From Swiss-Prot:
GN (gene name): recR
Glycoprotein as UniProt keyword: no
Statement: the UniProt record of this protein carries the keyword Zinc: yes
PANTHER family according to UniProt: RECOMBINATION PROTEIN RECR
Name the record gives this protein: Recombination protein RecR
Gene3D superfamilies per UniProt: 3.40.1360.10, 6.10.250.240, RecR Domain 1 (1.10.8.420)
Length: 201
């Protein structure tokens, strides 16, 4: 089919987004061109600025346009002494929305995966080890995903903490609030039973 080369290029570019296939990309492209050209221009400008100006925090490795992000430079968070280790910057947003954590973070940008050739240095564990040795950390909270790779990564970091004399803890995981036991998979239910706690009145 004969079509505009620029339109084809736009649709192909939109397909780099997760979950966007040919049809979705086509719909987005036509919507921007037909109904919202000003929105398309804002999107293009925001993307251009973000791609050129956003880098990584020198301390925690999350996304920021500053050398050190607002969380790491916050004196109250520095005094807290807790560092929460996560796999991606998106995990920080999820935890921050709970309002339950007032410490700092360290972003791995992935997890250990020997089969894919991803080792400790590839996810910044050499830098984390330096922080364990040089900073006064009261607790390292391991909030990696509850996958095989996430658990292996958490165990590896826990060993680093033991060597550095820093307390390490793992976030709890199990039956979701509002969930029904019969709908929960066996592995999750096993974790819930193993991580049970006493009810004190």
């Amino acid at each position: 089919m004969q079509t505009s080369p620029l339109l084809t290029q736009l649709m192909e570019a939109l397909r780099c987004l997760p979950g966007v296939g040919p049809k979705s990309a086509q719909r987005m492209a036509f919507t921007l061109l037909q109904r919202d050209r000003s929105g398309g221009m804002r999107l293009a400008q925001a993307l251009t600025r973000a791609m050129s100006e956003i880098g990584h925090c020198a301390d925690c490795r999350t996304f920021t346009e500053q050398d050190v992000c607002n969380i790491c430079s916050n004196p109250r968070r520095q005094e807290n002494g807790q560092i929460c280790v996560v796999e991606s910057p998106a995990d920080i947003y999820a935890i921050e929305q709970t309002g339950q954590f007032s410490g700092r973070y360290f972003v791995l940008m992935g997890h250990l995966s020997p089969l894919d050739g991803i080792g400790p240095d590839d996810i910044g564990l050499d830098r984390l080890e330096q922080r364990l040795a040089s900073e006064k950390i009261s607790e390292l909270i391991l909030a990696t995903n509850p996958t095989v790779e996430g658990e292996a990564t958490a165990n590896y970091i826990a060993e680093l903490c033991a060597e550095a004399g820093v307390e390490a803890s793992r976030i709890a995981h199990g039956v979701p609030v509002g969930g029904e036991l019969e709908m929960v998979d066996g592995t999750t239910l096993s974790h819930s039973l193993a991580g049970r706690h006493k009810i004190i009145f």
